[in-house]
């Protein structure tokens, strides 16, 4: 019998490798007639406002960003830039090699899976194209809920559709947005993914003082749920439950 009945994952830096803005974002800036540095500055300082959907849909949000950067592109350019930005964020997204095997193993063991992500409009648009999409029983996006981590509403919004109490859920994240403290306060057990590639990860509002358990790889999640076997890459590995500190 699994120790936890569900595992909820952060997305960027957890199910994905470390994220940095790639060169594709330059195309978005060019479409808007905006210097790249000015665009990035507004994007960075407005992240939580945008991730909570404060400015409306993707076009309205980018229009607000442009105004803050001092440019006022026509509607056609805004719409083209929204599509360009979606492609750029998608291009920045590389799933971890063990993301699909881990989710597959959890579901095969009867453990529910979910996504709880602080994100802007792009992720809900392209997530259905990713291999992890059919392996997630519930998806909670801050931009749709109107709240960001560490607000307990995000975590509890995942519990409801699963029909589970927070204590039945394990939360896994890299620690951005104070998400681990938020999950713990919501009544979940939280663990930090401390994979080596995250040293250069683009993160907002990290929690370096996290004193809870950490994992070196996403596959280590299975050691906390057990007994679960990871398919293909670890065919003989069946692990038992591991006790976590309260």
Label each region the model flagged.
Residues 1-9, 31-34, 76, 100, ...:
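Asp-based, Mg2+/Mn2+-dependent phosphohydrolase catalytic module
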Residues 1-101, 109, 121, 125:
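N-terminal helical cap/lid subdomain that shapes the substrate entry/recognition surface
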């Amino acid at each position: 019998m699994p120790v936890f009945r569900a595992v909820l994952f952060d997305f960027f830096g957890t199910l994905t490798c470390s994220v940095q803005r790639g060169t594709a974002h330059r195309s978005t800036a060019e479409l808007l007639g905006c210097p790249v540095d000015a665009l990035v500055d507004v994007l960075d300082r407005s992240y939580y406002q945008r991730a909570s959907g404060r400015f409306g849909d993707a076009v309205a949000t980018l229009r607000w960003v442009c105004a803050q950067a001092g440019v006022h592109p026509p509607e056609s350019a805004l719409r083209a830039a929204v599509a360009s930005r979606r492609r750029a964020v998608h291009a920045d997204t590389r799933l971890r090699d063990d993301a699909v095997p881990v989710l597959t193993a959890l579901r095969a063991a009867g453990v529910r899976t979910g996504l709880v992500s602080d994100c802007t409009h792009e992720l809900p648009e392209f997530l259905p194209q990713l291999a992890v999409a059919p392996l997630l029983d519930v998806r909670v996006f801050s931009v749709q809920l109107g709240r960001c981590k560490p607000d307990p509403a995000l975590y509890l919004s995942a519990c409801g559709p699963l029909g589970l109490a927070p204590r039945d859920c394990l939360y896994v994240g890299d620690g951005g947005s104070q998400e681990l403290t938020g999950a713990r306060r919501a009544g979940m057990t939280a663990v930090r993914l401390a994979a080596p590639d995250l040293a250069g990860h683009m993160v907002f509002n990290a929690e370096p003082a996290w004193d809870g358990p950490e994992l070196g790889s996403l596959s280590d999640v299975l050691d906390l749920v057990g007994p679960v076997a990871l398919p293909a890459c670890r065919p003989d590995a069946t692990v038992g439950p591991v006790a976590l500190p309260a």
